[in-house]
Amino acid sequence: MIDLLSEYRMDPTTWLYVASLMTIGIYFRFHRLLSIRNLDLIGLIAFAPGLLLIFHGIEAQGYLWLIAVSLLFLPRLLIDPAFSRRPLTEPNLAPGGMAFMAAALMFFLTANILTDRAVFAGGPAAGGGSDKVAAVRRVPMTRGPGFMPFYRAISLTRDHPGGIPPGETGGEAKDQRSAPSLVLRAGVKAVAIVCQFAIVLGMLFFGLRHFDNIQTGLAAASLYLLLPYTSLMTVRLDHLVPAAFVVWALASYRRPVIAGMSLGAAAGIAFYPFFLVPLWIGFYWRRGAVRFGVGVLTALIVLIIILLCLPSDMRQLQLDLAAMFGKGLFRSEGADGFWEFYPAVLRIPLIATLAVLAGSLALWPAEKNLGNLLSGTAALLLVAQLCLIHQSGLYMAWYAPALILVVFRPALEDRTAVRAVPPRPFGALPRLREP
């Protein structure tokens, strides 16, 4: 099977045109050209040129393009709760055709992951290309803040130039490295596939349980799979793992403990989802805040226990604990991506803006509904990934699923914590009217 897929590769530029035309044909509302839905779709398509510029080595302009499009979406997300009339708008494709397309896209995405050659930091680029372009598709060697053992495990960097320690022949080094490198390569790809399935299934579940319409969830998941970003950044676990946890935190919002554990895991791994915690506490303030806090603390305690169980000295343990809770947030050395070409000092007011935005969304409005939670989560993660010192603007998986769900969501005014969350931790879920 792998041999049959080994030559599978679609040029990114070709896929940009194909995916853009499919997005317009399937989702565009041709009878209302200036609708919010159509503008959202045009905005999602507009990310693709920036990605192509980056993958063709024109990084300064490419990252600037991504940042600009991201900032255009920010006011759209902040004013989304004001759009009270949200009629259900189905895609232009029948449910059976939509399901087939989603399954086909997932199959080819899996094939893309299995045949990806840009897993090791010293490996060749998938489909050729320069080392600079290939590096975009691999985890940066120096990271932080976050769960550093996770980043060390998925970076897969070699300790010596060319991967061959001094004093060893190429054959000896190959014998010593072949088994672990195969295991690590297979492990990264397996986790990437699991994360992509988790994101897609989470969006399907969200549509079924919270929109009461499986076709809407299917349309949202298919649009995520159609994004050129999804096919280009296939094995970046620093993108996918936090994204999968955030999606399932949203999907399980009616169970505060589970939502808290999912969000706590995302925050413990990538740190920046910590900025979501005030918003979620504000959502659960009238019911479920304590349970949500218990879930977040449980996930963080589990990650700390994992740190304690890993073989390391006390100094390394202290550094990893500090990085997990924000040490290195304002670090500017080793910048790559957007902040490699533009003054990194601008990150400081950007991080301050993120903190102010997190506090503001936590306080207003006083009673939040699921629509506020969705749009606020997408907005905060959109700004958070702009603050990254590494490849700022490229971490679209963090916010893209929530953003797409915002695009498709119906009216959700009655989905408040008081109405949707059971009064007891393991109580039956209250019955809600259809949106």
Question: Predicted regions: what is each one?
Answer:
Residues M1, P410, D414-P435:
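Short, intrinsically disordered terminal tails adjacent to the first/last structured region
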Residues M1-L250, V257, Y284-M396, A400, ...:
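Primarily membrane-embedded glycan-assembly and transfer machineries that use lipid-linked glycans
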Residues V257-W285, I389-L394:
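Transmembrane helices and adjacent periplasmic/lumenal helix-loop junctions
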Residues G260-L263, M396-P401, D414-V418:
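Composition- and surface-driven signal marking solvent-exposed, interaction-prone regions
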